Amino acid sequence: ESFEVEKLNLERERLIDLFSNNGIYNFQQRSIRFKAFKDSTGLDKKIPILLEINNSKIRNQELLLDVPYVIKKINSLSVFVENPEKSFRIFTDSINIDGFKIFSTGNLKYNPKIISNGIAIKKNNPYSLNDRKKTYKYFNELQIFKYPSIVYRENIKDSTKLDTEIYL
């Protein structure tokens, strides 16, 4: 098979997709490196390729820390629904449904099932970028919420878990 940079780019995209949809939260593209080795004698026309997947790099003040990737699972899921008629942002109502809690400013104006049906993110499942995209798509297509957003926070007690908040 001939050496083509485009094939390496496609493989990089495949790996990013694989990691990002199987629990690796914030996988960094720059963690993937390909090294090509050429026979200096010119006898072997094949070019061996070495794939390196490095740990993530996180800046902590003056230091650059090397942090291994770990699979992160969804620990909790909360949905916050704002009533556009209310000028304050105090959530006064809540309901438990399908393993998560929906908070609202005032009485919830929407059927909770309409909200829960669109959430592809599930408690105890590994983080998945595709689940995040599906959830965004659902709420954007409803066209009843202005700026849906999804926030993931590393759990304080267990760094392998993510607490998820959806703002509608």
Give the predicted meaning of each segment.
Residues 1-168:
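Immediate N-terminus of the mature polypeptide
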